[in-house]
Structure formats: structure tokens, C-alpha cells
Design a protein with these regions (language model features):
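Conserved short alpha-helical segments that host acidic/polar catalytic motifs at enzyme active sites
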Residues: 1-127
Length: 127
């Protein structure tokens, strides 16, 4: 089972999300990711491994915003062979959205074709 957290606050949420992910993780986790939103810009950091080794000080400084999502992944199918498979996912079409899901996608090939071959713009992403 994956761990998911969302926080909306009057203060920056990066540290609260990080602390929450530390509490949600356990052995078997293969990747983690945090996305924050500052005004209309998403800030994303994803990495393989455990939370305490995935985020450095510079990563946390870049995750500014008062809205954020965090995810720790426990593979039930496949594994995080690349950071691109870690969540949260950013989808640009039609306007830009960040999403996290807890489950197996059964139409991954169709989704991959749509996301990577058709919708290539990423205007709201800052990494």
C-alpha cells in the first residue's frame, strides 16, 4: 500500500509533507515524491529510495508553496526502475495538473502514448 499526504496551509508545506512521509514509509518503499504549488507554478522532486535519503536541503528549499502533495510508493506491480515512474505525476493537458493514485493502472500503454507522444508541453513545471 502506498502512502499519500496532501496539505494546504497558510505557511510553506514542504517540511510538513516531508515529516508526514517519514511517518508513512516502511521497509519495501522504492520511491518517493513531493510536489508543491506556489501561485501557479508546480515544484516537483522525485527520487528512488527512502524519504530520509531522497531529499537534500537544496531539494527542500526548492519545494516552496502553501499547497502540496507527497507520496511514498510500495510496488505491487513492477518497480521504480526510473524516477519517471515515481509519483506525483505531472500532466500538462489540458491545463496542468499533478496527481497521485493508489492502485494499479490497467491501461498504462494507452496513457503513456497520450502523455508522452501527444501532450509534450510542460508550461507549469519548474525543476
Amino acid at each position: 500500500m502506498c502512502g499519500i499526504v496532501e496539505i494546504v496551509s497558510s505557511d510553506d508545506v514542504n517540511q510538513q509533507i516531508y515529516d508526514s512521509l517519514l511517518l508513512l514509509q516502511h521497509r519495501g518503499q522504492d520511491s518517493t515524491g513531493i510536489t508543491t504549488m506556489e501561485n501557479t507554478i508546480f515544484h516537483i522532486h522525485k527520487a528512488k529510495g527512502h524519504v530520509n535519503t531522497a531529499y537534500r536541503t537544496r531539494d527542500m528549499r526548492n519545494l516552496i508553496g502553501k499547497i502540496g502533495l507527497g507520496h511514498v510508493r510500495y510496488a505491487t506491480k513492477g518497480s521504480a526502475e526510473s524516477v519517471e515512474e515515481a509519483q506525483p505525476f505531472y500532466v500538462n493537458a489540458p491545463y496542468g495538473i499533478v496527481l497521485i493514485h493508489n492502485g494499479n493502472l490497467t491501461n498504462t500503454r494507452d496513457l503513456e502514448k497520450q502523455l508522452f507522444n501527444v501532450d509534450k508541453r510542460h508550461t507549469h513545471l519548474k525543476n
